[in-house]
Design a protein with these regions (language model features):
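Asp-box/WD-like beta-propeller blade repeats and closely related beta-sheet repeat scaffolds
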Residues: 79-171, 185-188
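A short beta-strand motif characteristic of beta-propeller blades
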Residues: 23-29, 73-79, 115-121, 182-187, ...
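Blade/loop signatures of beta-propeller domains
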Residues: 1-23, 167, 171
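Short, conserved, GDST-rich strand-edge loop motifs in beta-rich repeat architectures
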Residues: 2-4, 52-60, 143-168, 209-218, ...
């Protein structure tokens, strides 16, 4: 029920690998923070928004919650019958507005007034996904892909992921004003479209991806003008590139992970890839840094196997989720890298919700990540960045 408050479940322990204090914020049910391209923290860094099935533990029907990090108290904010799927929540940087998908509805929640409004209802045979606010908080962009699933994507160990890539021939980038007006498609494509993200400093610019195993996708990242519909590739890929998990830096540049040939961008519960054997050339993976026009202006070798990376505000420190550990990667002025283990996460990697998706707090002092232990427990963890790395 909306407004229900849950007592603190948090407790702190010393990580067995790094010795760093780690605070486990939840210890019951399924819980996970927002997708790594969004930030779960409010501007004060005193509260986080997250999803949980604690109000419906017999199913994976999750709702939206807010937690005060000092007290650990949690409050339920939504109670939609269809629930909210993982990674289908986004919010404005100031934390005032939250948008999410439930079933075929796009809804808007105002954290100040607590008003919850229906903005859009899908009437066609499309699946809604990947929503994101423009930086001026006036529009919400999202993807709509034809519902052609023979095997539903999102199962264990990327079940249905490759099949969905081949099946979808109608993918769209759509937009709507936050008052519910002027819904329209900006782009219609012949590929599964995903990972839509507005630029953090230009409300007209966004990026999206052609989704699928990285070794099957010919061109992953695209930059689009949301006012004109013009789009262009970001970093023109060659046969030896396997690119993905792109995100915007706070300064408005695009950062992407190029693992080179032989990598599909997945990880399974066995700790290995799903769709590719590691038979590539042995070329060193790297981070690419690109401007909004898609041109790459910097590359930094990144010889570490992490599944997702994210950067702090000044790009001096990256966080990643390696097979077993949450790691920090510091970058010096010459592009040199140094890896520091922050915590052993022990996640199973079985489901998308098992992925750690680590991210920084807005002030860059804390790392938030999720990890599971079995099919019915998924928890959220908080760890401070060591002072010597700040």
């Amino acid at each position: 029920m909306i407004g229900t408050k849950w007592p603190s479940e948090k407790h702190t322990f010393l990580d067995p690998v790094s010795g760093q204090p780690v605070t486990q914020l939840t210890d019951q049910y399924l819980n996970f923070h927002l997708y790594f391209t969004d930030n779960s923290f409010d501007p004060s860094c005193e509260n986080i928004y997250f999803q949980s099935n604690r109000c419906n533990p017999e199913a994976e029907r999750c709702q939206l919650f807010r937690m005060n990090l000092e007290s650990g108290e949690m409050e339920q904010l939504t109670d939609d019958p269809a629930g909210i799927m993982q990674a289908q929540v986004t919010k404005t940087k100031d934390g005032k507005l939250i948008a999410y998908f439930t079933g075929k509805e796009l809804r808007l929640y105002n954290t100040e007034t607590r008003e919850n409004t229906l903005l859009y209802e899908e009437k066609g045979d499309f699946i809604l996904s990947n929503l994101f606010f423009s930086c001026d908080s006036k529009k919400i962009g999202f993807t709509r892909n034809e519902d052609r699933d023979t095997i539903p994507d999102g199962g264990p160990n990327y079940l249905g992921f490759k099949e969905k890539m081949f099946a979808i021939k109608d993918g769209r980038v759509s937009v709507i004003n936050v008052d519910g007006s002027d819904f329209h498609d900006v782009l219609r494509d012949t590929h599964w479209i995903s990972h839509f993200q507005y630029s953090p400093d230009d409300p007209a610019i966004a990026m999206f991806c052609h989704e699928g195993p990285w070794n099957y996708v010919q061109q992953r990242i695209w930059v689009i003008n949301m006012e004109t519909g013009d789009f262009r590739p970001c970093f023109r890929q060659s046969e030896e590139d396997c690119v993905g998990h792109e995100f915007w830096s706070e300064g408005g540049d695009i950062i992407f992970d190029n693992r080179r040939d032989g990598h599909d961008g997945t990880i399974s519960s066995s700790g290995t890839q799903v769709f590719a054997e590691e038979t590539g050339s042995g070329r060193t993976p790297y981070f690419g840094f690109a401007h909004k026009d898609g041109t790459v202006y910097r590359k930094i070798d990144m010889p570490f196997y992490c599944n997702h990376y994210y950067a702090n505000a000044d790009l001096s420190l990256f966080v990643g989720d390696a097979v077993k550990d949450i790691v920090l990667i510091s970058i010096d002025e010459n592009g040199g890298t140094k890896l520091t283990t922050l915590a052993r996460h022990n996640t199973t990697w079985k489901y998308q919700r098992s992925h750690c998706h680590p991210n920084f707090s807005w002030d860059g002092k804390k790392i938030l990540y999720s990890a599971d232990t079995d099919d019915t427990h998924d928890n959220i963890f908080l760890v401070e960045v060591p002072k010597e790395l700040l």
